Amino acid sequence: MANPKAKMSKSRRDKRRAQFNARTKPVTTVNCPNCGEPTLPHRACRHCGHYRGRAVTGKTANG
């Protein structure tokens, strides 16, 4: 019966397990209510810099 040669750290174990989800689940996107560009949920828009109705980065509305 095979035995591991050394203990695998929790970080290495979790990195390996994360690859399965990254390959199987599609990326979820939502449209920015300010400019309409597709963005990742719960993150500021890369195009206009708004999040939840407020400008959080120094970008302008036209890019």
Swiss-Prot record:
Any Pfam family hit: Ribosomal_L32p
InterPro entries: Ribosomal_bL32, Ribosomal_bL32_bact, Ribosomal_zn-bd
GO biological process: translation
GO cellular component: large ribosomal subunit
Sequence ranges of Basic residues compositional bias: 7-18
Keywords annotated in UniProt: Ribonucleoprotein, Ribosomal protein
Gene Ontology molecular-function annotations: structural constituent of ribosome
Disordered: annotated span: 1-27
HAMAP family xrefs: Ribosomal_bL32
Similarity remark: Belongs to the bacterial ribosomal protein bL32 family.
Name of the protein: Large ribosomal subunit protein bL32
Organism name: Chlorobium phaeobacteroides (strain DSM 266 / SMG 266 / 2430)
Gene field: rpmF
